Amino acid sequence: MDTQAVRAYLLDLQDRITTAASALDGGTFVTDAWEKPPTERLRGSGRTRILEGGALLERGGVGFSHVMGDTLPPSATANRPELAGRGFEAMGVSLVFHPRNPYVPTVHMNVRCFVAVRSDAAPVWWFGGGMDLTPYYGFTEDASHFHRTCQGALAPYGDELYPRFKQWCDDYFYLKHRKEARGIGGIFFDDFAELGFERSFEMMRSVGDAFLPAWLPIAEQRHATAYGERERAFQAYRRGRYVEFNLVFDRGTLFGLQSGGRAESILMSMPPVANWRYDWQPEPGSPEAALYTDFLPARDWV
């Protein structure tokens, strides 16, 4: 179990993604290297990269973190109660890109490795991650491209993984109180160890490496599309759903805050502008209504 190899991969992935996104945007990611004091309950370090006010990205963050703690927080043991009381080591890259143009979808990607340790037992490790797309104005060809790229990343590791991880994503990124999906999904996995460490790590790398091919062509095609105040207002309204999900349901956000993580890095996933309108409904037959009827309901995109 070579966690240093995982760390090296994650740092390189962060470099590659920020380089490509910066080239398309024309702006520069600011790097904020941080380290937790050894006296705090959560120890470790990380490297947050953020671009705000760009031509493409109104706000985009790509964070790397490598942290350790003496006791797993409740969010990490909810599905694994046998691990309660163990110490842990966690490392990962997480990103959220909130584009300025409403025709470019918001995108989220995360890959991570987790090790739960106890002095009198063997370490328990697993990988997690995935990526998902949140359009404001949907295009079938974009959704199909994104899902086909996810499917291709998983294909070498078993044909059953894509439909399994897609369903997991559809179930996970769902706002129960709204009875609607956050977006058009993608793939999501957690507690994954079934291929052995090396092969599971390879699968995680394949997912991480698929992010740029999945999202960048969509951004390149849509970022120059003309838009007005109507589209920006709808984008801000739908971003409100993103805020609701991240603060109420997201396991990564809850884990970070419960374990004493760095709030600025954890909350970089928040959109720069969002709003709420009481009982707002889209005009029937409008492009905004099409998001609800044609894109948010779970469906097969490949």
Curated annotation (Swiss-Prot):
The record marks 177 as: Important for dimerization. The active site is at residue 108. This is Oxygen-dependent coproporphyrinogen-III oxidase. Substrate binds at residues 94, 110-112, 260-262. The gene is hemF. It is an enzyme of class 1 (oxidoreductase). NCBIfam families: PRK05330.1. The lineage of its organism: Bacteria, Pseudomonadati, Pseudomonadota, Betaproteobacteria, Burkholderiales. Homodimer. It catalyses: coproporphyrinogen III + O2 + 2 H(+) = protoporphyrinogen IX + 2 CO2 + 2 H2O. Its EC number is 1.3.3.3. It comes from Ralstonia pickettii (strain 12J). The keyword Cytoplasm applies.
